[in-house]
């Protein structure tokens, strides 16, 4: 499909330049904020789980997220079975953010699929863009980690606390630092 014939929402989720002040996108963000407000103010974990299932694009059955949670839209977030996120998780989900099964997120983990043009003229036009983030299975992400647009992490990755992940990494590694780099390989035990 030609981008001229796409809605701003379609452009956004495909990582193309889009107008974030589009009426449909503004409405979507408002609806997400209303659900997030209910989620963050609920003491009932079953109610929070139900809200998450309404908000996210897809989830496994076994998920647990501690308040507070922040999202842009919610519908571009996809998490697998056995997902745990501690408090302070942020998803800037202009593009899809996909996380596999058996993921553990420590406090204050941030996923930024949103970005802005580097060229100042384009940036000042108000148009934005994004790049998807994809995280594999069996991943543990430490406290305060920031994952930037376009990053892909393989299976069995451990991300050290405070890391800023600016590029993609394969499976079975421990990464840490700013910018994140491989600290060591993880030997995989056969089952």
Swiss-Prot record:
Q: What is its EC number?
A: 2.3.1.-
Give the species this sequence originates from: Dictyostelium discoideum (Social amoeba)
**Stored SUPFAM superfamilies:** Trimeric LpxA-like enzymes (SSF51161)
Name the top EC class: transferase
Q: Does the keyword Transferase apply?
A: yes
Going by the UniProt record, its keywords in alphabetical order are: Acyltransferase, Transferase
Recite the lineage of the species: Eukaryota, Amoebozoa, Evosea, Eumycetozoa, Dictyostelia
Task: Provide the protein name.
Answer: Putative acetyltransferase DDB_G0280825
Q: Name one GO molecular function term.
A: O-acyltransferase activity
UniProt xrefs under SMART domains? Mac (SM01266)
- InterPro entries named among the record's database cross-references: Hexapep, Hexapeptide_acetyltransf, Mac_dom, Trimer_LpxA-like_sf
| Family under the similarity heading | Belongs to the transferase hexapeptide repeat family.
Signal peptide limits:
none
């Amino acid at each position: 499909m030609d981008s001229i014939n796409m809605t701003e929402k379609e452009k956004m989720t495909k990582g193309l330049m889009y107008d974030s002040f589009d009426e449909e996108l503004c409405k979507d963000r408002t609806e997400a904020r209303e659900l997030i407000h209910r989620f963050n103010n609920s003491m009932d974990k079953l109610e929070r789980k139900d809200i998450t299932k309404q908000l996210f694009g897809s989830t496994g059955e076994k998920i647990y997220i501690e308040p507070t949670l922040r999202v842009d839209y919610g519908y571009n977030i996809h998490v697998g079975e056995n997902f745990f996120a501690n408090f302070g998780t942020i998803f800037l989900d202009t593009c899809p953010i996909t996380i596999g099964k058996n993921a553990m997120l420590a406090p204050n983990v941030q996923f930024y699929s949103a970005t802005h043009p580097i060229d100042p003229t384009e940036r000042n036009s108000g148009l934005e863009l994004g790049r998807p983030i994809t995280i594999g299975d069996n991943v543990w992400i430490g406290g305060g980690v920031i994952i930037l647009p376009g990053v892909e992490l393989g299976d069995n990755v451990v991300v050290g606390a405070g890391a800023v992940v600016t590029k993609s990494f394969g499976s079975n590694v421990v990464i840490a630092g700013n910018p994140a780099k491989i600290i060591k390989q993880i030997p995989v035990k056969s089952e």
